[in-house]
Design a protein with these regions (language model features):
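Cationic, low-complexity basic patches in intrinsically disordered or flexible, solvent-exposed regions
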Residues: 5-6, 10
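Active-site loop-to-helix "anion-binding N-cap" substructures in soluble metabolic enzymes
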Residues: 11-271
Length: 271
């Protein structure tokens, strides 16, 4: 992945072909899966990445971040974390800061995943603080947003998604340090996927909110990922949508072959 120094910090570039278009990002979220024995899958993905045009990310458990980072030889694959504390240090038993994650090799951090929002009670206000902490450490940050099935049935998708986006983005967010991931909660791990029209509509709405919050230039450059039961057999159609710039992949990222096949589906979009 190309990079540059901005205020002495690592920042991921998102442009290809002479800075003309958003470059695809395929991010894997391993959740609470993976041990040292799983590093062989990461090695396979690392080797395959040199043949791919997309940027690749694997957010693995904290326990294997360092070991995974040591295995990476490609510049197209980053190892990341799935969460961080909003403070740099202190009396927060069991938590880990962005500074600590960076110290062991994390190059990017996910914040605001629905499993953190709903199972751990994290609010958008807290997500914003976590994103700000990650960005302060010079780590590109994936901010997750998405509605529940109940909210979808009530017709609240746009209201929920836009509110989460507005409240979860720190002032420091821009196209170089922030990636948005739209993950309808009801689609995560269920096999259910919104229609292409629905995905396109929500991503377009997110792009419009980014324009209002960050201005036209940043809104056109910031990547928006789709997440929720993304698999090799549906990825190509999803990636064909104008405002979809990649995917946040769950279970399918645990197996190198599946993850690589998803990334290959983005080739036509990235080339």
């Amino acid at each position: 992945m190309a990079s540059q120094q901005l205020d002495g910090k690592y920042i991921s570039l998102i442009w290809s072909k002479g800075m003309r278009k958003r470059k695809c990002l395929i991010a894997g979220n391993w959740k609470m899966n993976g041990t040292l024995e799983s590093l062989s899958e990461i090695v396979k993905i690392d080797k395959a990445s040199v043949q791919l045009d997309s940027d690749l990310v694997l957010c693995v458990p904290n326990t294997i971040i360092h070991a995974a980072s040591e295995k990476i030889t490609s510049t197209k694959l980053l190892i990341g974390a799935q969460n961080c504390h909003q403070e740099e240090n202190g009396a927060f038993t069991g938590d880990i800061s962005a500074k600590m994650l960076k110290n062991v090799g994390a190059k990017i951090i996910i914040v605001g995943h629905s499993e953190r929002r709903f199972e751990c009670g994290e609010t958008s206000s807290l997500v914003e603080k976590k994103a700000a902490a990650s960005i302060r450490m010079g780590l590109p940050t994936i901010i997750c947003i998405g509605e529940t099935e109940e909210q979808k049935i009530k017709g609240e998708t746009e209201t929920v998604v836009c509110s989460q986006l507005e409240r979860s983005m720190p002032d420091a967010s821009n196209d170089l340090n922030t990636i948005i991931a739209y993950e309808p909660v009801w689609a995560i791990g269920t096999g259910k996927v919104p229609t292409l029209e629905d995905i396109a509509h929500v991503h377009r709405r997110i792009r419009n909110v980014l324009k209002q919050e960050k201005g036209k230039d940043i809104s056109q450059k910031m990547r928006i990922l789709y997440g929720g039961s993304v698999k090799p057999d549906n990825a190509k159609e999803i990636f064909s949508l104008e405002d979809v710039d990649g995917a946040l992949v769950g279970g399918a990222s645990l197996k190198a072959d599946d993850f690589i096949n998803i990334a290959k589906k983005a080739q036509t979009r990235c080339s």
